[in-house]
């Protein structure tokens, strides 16, 4: 997140979000309350956080996914349903369905892949990787369910050596 130092001071500085599990979202909410914000992609900025292993990505998502859903079982159910309908059912229909179901699945899968290609191009990734979007979404679905499960056990938000998320209700 790029911002001016005086703008950060105006919203209370880092102290204002010190206890937030998802600090970038908490900071964005502080700025959003003051007016419009711009979210965008650029070639000129690179992340300094490294996620070299699959488990690093899983832990990063699991750490905060259920918190992002407000620890709400209803929002979790909605997110699961949306991910299944949008990303999982189309390729299953394309590969295992027949007739109209297969055509619908192929069309939906092709559309999601085509819409993902511009993002892949920004990061210099082969457009063929767009075909993996359903598998990526399914992985995120599993990470989100793990996040909820860990929160319900009082072990959510593990970050920097401690459990930081509140216990799910």
Where are these regions (language model features)?
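Conserved beta strand-loop-helix elements of the APE1-like EEP
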Residues: 2-4
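Catalytic donor/gating beta->alpha subdomain of glycosyltransferases that bind UDP-sugars
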Residues: 6-9, 14-75, 157, 162-164
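Membrane-proximal soluble regions of multi-pass membrane proteins
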Residues: 25, 36-41, 46, 129-169
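Short, charged low-complexity intrinsically disordered segments located at boundaries
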Residues: 58-62, 89-96, 165-169
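Membrane-embedded multi-pass helical conduit in multi-pass membrane proteins
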Residues: 75-155
């Amino acid at each position: 997140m790029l911002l001016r130092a005086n703008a950060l001071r105006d919203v209370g500085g880092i102290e204002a979000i010190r206890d937030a599990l998802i600090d970038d979202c908490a900071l964005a909410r502080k700025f959003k309350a003051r007016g419009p914000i711009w979210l965008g992609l650029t070639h000129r900025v690179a992340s300094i956080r490294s996620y070299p292993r699959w488990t690093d990505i899983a832990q990063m998502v699991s750490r905060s996914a259920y918190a992002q859903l407000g620890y709400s079982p209803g929002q979790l159910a909605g997110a699961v349903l949306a991910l299944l309908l949008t990303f999982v059912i189309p390729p299953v229909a394309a590969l295992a369905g027949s007739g109209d179901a297969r055509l619908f699945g192929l069309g939906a899968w092709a559309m999601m892949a085509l819409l993902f290609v511009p993002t892949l191009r920004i990061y210099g990734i082969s457009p063929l990787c767009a075909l993996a979007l359903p598998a990526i979404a399914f992985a995120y679905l599993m990470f989100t369910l793990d996040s909820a499960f860990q929160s319900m056990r009082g072990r959510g938000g593990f970050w920097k050596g401690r459990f930081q998320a509140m216990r799910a209700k």
